């Protein structure tokens, strides 16, 4: 399923960018150090929230991808559950629709 693979790759790249950029929200008066653009165990709420959200999004989309792959391996091609899982994946991609790598076929 190349469309699922392309969408997963697109989402992974966007989330990697968000993880990297989370350090930009590090507060100046926080005693925790920022090293090489990464937030390392500080008490700033914003970077932690960004990183937690990205981790949760990754977990949900990974579960959706596994469901699609599992059903495909069993010979079920785009069952109702797979279609629903793919719609969830496309919904996670929607906030990035202005990115040059966005594909219109990903619109939920």
Regions found by a protein language model. Name each.
Residues 1-35, 54, 58:
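Aromatic-glycine hotspot motif
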Residues 2-10, 41-62, 85-108:
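Flexible loop/turn and low-complexity linker elements, especially glycine-anchored beta turns
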Residues 26, 30-33, 42-44, 79, ...:
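Functionally engaged cysteine thiol sites
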